[in-house]
């Protein structure tokens, strides 16, 4: 019988897809969206979107959302303070200065072809869309984030294309691939668990 390894300091379990778009033909980011769908955390379940969009380069101007939108403020605070604020692409954009805003979420999926999340707050709707997954694989990594050591496991689908729309207006930007350990700047991440190991 194989040995069962038990780790108890589970901080987050759920989903954490990402979309990062670049100014076409460059390495300059114009939008970063980190979506969290939490099944378990010490702060409870819920959904959160941490997002930054460059108002000028994206073509959205004053429509560009910057901040954290959620249906569980405590959970959103947990993922921001513990994880997202240490991600260099989300630093220096004033996200930490914005009040966490209440939002509603819907999700639509069509296997490897399409995955869509809509985040609505007030009269505004942000849509994230991942298209044409290129692969599916399981990973286990042990990164250091925020001064803690973690074991992170997930099922990843790097995507060929992705987009962000705000009230139907698309961000002007493109996905880069290959990029990073997940081989695309837009990927789905399911069955994701963050366990503190040090």
Regions found by a protein language model. Give the residues of each.
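Targeting-peptide/extracellular-domain and disordered-appendage signature
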Residues: 1-198
């Amino acid at each position: 019988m194989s040995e069962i390894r038990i780790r108890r300091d589970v901080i987050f379990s759920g989903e954490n897809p990402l979309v990062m778009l670049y100014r076409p033909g460059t390495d300059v980011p114009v939008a970063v969206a980190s979506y969290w769908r939490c099944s378990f955390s010490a702060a409870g379940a819920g959904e959160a979107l941490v997002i930054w969009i460059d108002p000028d380069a994206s073509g959205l101007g004053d429509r560009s959302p910057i901040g954290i939108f959620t249906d569980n403020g405590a959970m959103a605070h947990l993922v921001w303070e513990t994880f997202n604020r240490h991600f260099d692409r989300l630093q220096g954009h004033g996200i930490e200065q914005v009040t966490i805003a209440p939002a509603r979420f819907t999700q639509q999926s069509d296997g490897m072809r399409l995955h869509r999340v809509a985040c609505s707050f007030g009269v505004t709707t942000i849509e994230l869309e991942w298209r044409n997954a290129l692969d599916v694989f399981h990973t286990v990594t042990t990164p250091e984030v925020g001064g803690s050591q973690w074991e992170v496991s997930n099922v990843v689908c790097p995507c060929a294309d992705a987009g962000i729309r705000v009230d139907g207006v698309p961000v002007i930007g493109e996905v880069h691939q290959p990029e990073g350990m997940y081989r695309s700047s837009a990927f789905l991440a399911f069955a994701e668990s963050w366990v503190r190991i040090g």
